[in-house]
């Protein structure tokens, strides 16, 4: 009899088998589910602390997604040969899992919860992210933790006008859409997508298609939970101090004072006024237990003020209605030495965005389970503490910065020129210099402007807008271009980026149990209106790409050579190509198909490198004169290097017009000479002549020599 009490559910989903199994691995975790989709397997575990840490006024949820190299039969690189810090993908998938599960934990639950998803097998066809999200939902559902799930998730593609459920990794490049949607039976909680300028209707259809298709997964999780779910945790009753403190605040008029403070339009002044009200409110309390619950109560009071005003009057914190976008100011070319730059300001949110162009040598090499590849477009988002008027830690980017940068990257990528027509590596850096909401979308707008300022031929400008939602019962209001407070106190963060023709990126996070198709449709339509308005403001600064790349950027010239000549251009151990780069100052990239990219800020340097390469691959032509260098002197002549790495022999009889006794009397190693191709011997070796070329002018004097010989011959004949 087995020592394991295994429970297993299996369904066919998207043409592949999905298996949920628990009871064999990681049995000491509160919940552990092994998910297998195709031959991709992910172990998802959940552990909750049995008690709440004192003084915690937030929900401490941590999600760690990790990919093990052995899952794809690989050994990690590097000196230590083991997995190290999380990769960008691991960070992004961790956020992808966190976002739909966080709002489903019971209000007031403050125990620490840790989710760990470990990729144990990867078939290189089914991306582990969907399996990890499904497994996390299943593990939480059976754990007994106060999780109001389960959650389902699916990836949606769009090929030839039809939606595709969970497209294979190899099929995604053919898809016009890569969308991940997660939600409950009732509605959608999270969307993350990249699209090739698709309409709002197509995007909404994809979301609802995914929602329908993952219902089978939710049912499988429910069936598993009915067999093996642990007893639900007992939630502690709200402390008695909550009612006491709420009463004290109401009696002291704190809600009314907060309402007055939130009428101040300027962010810093408003924060100061709100802070003063909170300080005054806390002074009413003397007991430690009362102070411990005061923060949460004040936040609820703030939310009631902000949300109530919007739903009742349609007027927001800064005086706008629900559809108005803040004032926009655009400047381009703000940094004199940068290849492209833009300062994008929208209200109190500002991004300084800089584009830099490089060569193939600057591409980022990314090593993933699916294999190594090179990325020629990078977008990095930085959020320094001064942008919100604070002093804080500076260091490597956090999860939020990585996620925001990737969202802007997704928004821009569908509109970038093909690598074949624009062979530059592009790096965009967005420095957030002021922030009051929608900084990631400001990064999209600034990136579009900076790239066009750098001369990157974008077919159309790209803009982004962040939408919000206030929902109470059946009443709701969709907000365009949300402020930071509207994000924190609202029910939705819905970001849409795209061109005048369609959507390129969409990200949605819901903080309530779910939203309906009706709300999403209104939000998408309102976002389109806002995006078109923003594009119009951007066009006032720059409406199309510069005619050429910046004068500070390298100029890349592409030439092609026969593949069999690549070895000659590179040389033994890279000797030849290194010499070309060192002598000319140009950068050279050689592809396996014989495509060569020569880059240099100095056009003359690039041309010298091109001429050198063409000389190497050119075949010597009979009767043509070339410049060369003597590389070896022997008794019977001199070997001369010409046409790059090609050598030929100048026989001693072809060194000079007069008779030569010793080769060294005429040339020495290192001499620069002019030679004419006389022909080729049986082995393909080149026969050269110096005497048939005027070494000063480079002119062909063979006719003159022939005439002299003929005259000399006639003279001898006459004498005879």
From Swiss-Prot:
GO terms for biological process: mRNA catabolic process; RNA processing. GO terms for cellular component: cytosol. Its cofactor is Mg(2+). Its EC number is 2.7.7.8. It catalyses: RNA(n+1) + phosphate = RNA(n) + a ribonucleoside 5'-diphosphate. Residues 706-720 have a biased composition (Basic and acidic residues). Residues 554-613 form the KH domain. GO terms for molecular function: 3'-5'-RNA exonuclease activity; magnesium ion binding; polyribonucleotide nucleotidyltransferase activity; RNA binding. The keyword Nucleotide-binding does not apply. Residues 623-691 form the S1 motif domain. It comes from the Bacteria. Keywords: Cytoplasm, Magnesium, Metal-binding, Nucleotidyltransferase, RNA-binding, Transferase. Its main location: cytoplasm. Signal peptide: none annotated. It is an enzyme of class 2 (transferase). Residues 695-720 are annotated as: Disordered. HAMAP family: PNPase (MF_01595). Belongs to the polyribonucleotide nucleotidyltransferase family. Involved in mRNA degradation. Catalyzes the phosphorolysis of single-stranded polyribonucleotides processively in the 3'- to 5'-direction. This is Polyribonucleotide nucleotidyltransferase.
């Amino acid at each position: 009899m087995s020592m394991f009490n295994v429970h297993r559910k299996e369904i066919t989903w998207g043409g592949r088998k999905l298996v949920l199994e628990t009871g064999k691995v990681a049995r000491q975790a509160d919940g552990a589910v092994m998910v297998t989709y195709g031959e991709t397997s992910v172990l998802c575990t959940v552990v909750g602390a049995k008690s709440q840490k004192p003084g915690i006024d937030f929900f401490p949820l941590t999600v760690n997604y990790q990919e093990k190299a052995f899952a794809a039969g690989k050994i990690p690189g590097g000196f230590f040969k083991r997995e190290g810090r999380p990769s960008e993908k691991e960070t992004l998938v961790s956020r992808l899992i966190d976002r739909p599960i966080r709002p489903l934990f019971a209000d007031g639950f403050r125990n620490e919860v840790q989710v760990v998803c470990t990729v144990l097998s990867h078939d290189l066809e089914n991306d582990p992210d969907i399996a990890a999200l499904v497994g996390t939902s299943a593990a939480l559902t059976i754990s007994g933790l106060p999780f109001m799930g389960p959650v389902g998730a699916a990836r949606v593609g769009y090929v030839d006008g039809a939606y595709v459920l969970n497209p294979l990794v190899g099929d995604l490049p053919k898809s016009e859409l890569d969308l991940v949607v997660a939600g409950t039976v009732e509605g959608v909680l999270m969307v993350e997508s990249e699209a090739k300028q698709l309409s709002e209707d197509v995007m909404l259809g994809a979301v609802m298609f995914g929602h329908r298709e993952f219902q089978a997964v939710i049912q499988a999780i429910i069936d598993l939970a009915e067999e093996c779910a642990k007893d639900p945790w007992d939630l502690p009753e709200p402390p008695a101090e909550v009612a006491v403190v709420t009463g004290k605040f109401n009696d002291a008029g704190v809600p009314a004072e907060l309402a007055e403070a939130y009428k101040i339009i300027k962010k810093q002044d408003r924060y100061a006024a709100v802070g003063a009200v909170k300080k005054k409110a806390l002074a009413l309390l003397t007991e430690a237990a009362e102070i411990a619950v005061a923060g949460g109560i004040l936040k609820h009071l703030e939310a009631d003020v902000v949300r109530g005003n919007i739903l009742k009057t349609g007027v927001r914190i800064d005086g706008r209605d629900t559809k108005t976008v803040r004032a926009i100011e655009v400047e381009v070319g703000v940094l004199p030495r940068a290849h492209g730059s833009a300062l994008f300001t929208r209200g109190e949110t500002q991004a300084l965005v800089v584009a830099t162009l490089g060569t193939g040598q600057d591409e980022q090499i990314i090593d993933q389970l699916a294999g190594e590849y090179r990325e020629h477009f990078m977008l990095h988002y930085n959020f320094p503490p001064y942008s919100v008027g604070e002093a804080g830690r500076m260091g490597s980017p956090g999860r939020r910065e990585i996620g925001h940068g990737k969202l802007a990257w997704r928004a821009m990528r569908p509109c970038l020129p093909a690598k074949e027509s624009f062979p530059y590596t592009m790096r965009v850096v967005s420095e957030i210099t002021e922030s009051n909401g929608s900084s990631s979308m400001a990064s999209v707008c600034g990136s579009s402007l900076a790239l066009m300022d750098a001369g990157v031929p974008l077919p159309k400008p790209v803009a982004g807008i962040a939408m919000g939602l206030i929902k109470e019962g059946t009443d709701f209001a969709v907000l365009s271009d949300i402020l930071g407070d509207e994000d924190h106190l609202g029910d939705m963060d819905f970001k849409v980026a795209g061109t005048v023709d369609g959507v390129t990126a969409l990200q949605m996070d819901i903080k309530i149990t779910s939203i309906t198709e009706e709300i999403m449709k209104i939000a998408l339509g309102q976002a389109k209106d806002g995006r078109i308005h923003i594009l119009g403001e951007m066009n006032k600064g720059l409406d199309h790409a510069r005619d050429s790349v910046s004068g500070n950027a390298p100029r890349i010239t592409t030439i092609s050579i026969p593949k069999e000549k690549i070895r000659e251009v590179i040389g033994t151990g890279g000797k030849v190509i290194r010499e070309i780069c060192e002598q000319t100052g140009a950068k050279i990239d050689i592809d396996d198909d014989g495509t060569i990219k020569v880059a240099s800020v100095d056009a003359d340097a690039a041309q010298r490198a091109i001429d050198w390469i063409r000389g190497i691959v050119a075949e010597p032509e009979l009767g043509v004169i070339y410049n060369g260098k003597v590389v070896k002197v022997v008794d019977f002549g001199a070997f001369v290097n010409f046409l790059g790495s090609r050598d030929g022999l100048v026989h001693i009889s072809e060194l000079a017009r007069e008779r030569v006794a010793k080769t060294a009397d005429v040339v020495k190693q290192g001499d620069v000479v002019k030679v004419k191709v006389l022909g080729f011997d049986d082995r393909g070796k080149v026969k050269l002549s110096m005497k048939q070329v005027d070494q000063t002018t480079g002119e062909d004097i063979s006719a003159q020599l022939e005439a002299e010989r003929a005259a000399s011959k006639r003279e001898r004949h006459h004498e005879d």
